[in-house]
Amino acid sequence: ISFRLAYGGAQERFGGRPDLTVFGKIIGGGLPVGAVGGRAEIMALLDPTAGKARVESGGTFSGNPLTMVAGHAALTKWTRDAVDRLNAMGARLRQRVDAVFAEAGEAGQLAGEGSLFRLMLTRETIRDYRTSVRTAQPMARMTAIHKRLMQEGIIISRIGLGCLSTPMGESELDAFVE
């Protein structure tokens, strides 16, 4: 999540300097990969050449050539302009979907931050994580909307989670809103 919010991650967006920062599959173009970064003295614990006690690190996909090539390709497209464009698209999508629900007199909104969103079928304003989890979703209605979106080629999770990606443009936003 943190990498999507700003080019420099959540720490750029909200300020602060974390001891550790973790990135998920977005850095691999959706393939199974992650990365950990942090202060030098913490990262030194992972250094196998340090000659002192360290933390073992590794994994099934560590250094996997396909994943590394995909990650390199994804990160060459992940520019400051691309992040800003996606986040602006996310804001427009949320505004447009919210307007559709309001005009129809229906309970619903698209909550989220940056290029991430969650369809919430409620009139209660979703301000934070707490309000999102205390709000019960009418699952029959959510299932019907999810099914319709899938029929139109729009993929979100069954609970309404979704995200925008760099190849998307205004036509994808239009399709979602319709």
Please place each PLM-identified region on the residue numbering.
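Conserved N-terminal phosphate-binding loop of PLP-dependent enzymes in the Aspartate aminotransferase
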Residues: 1-178
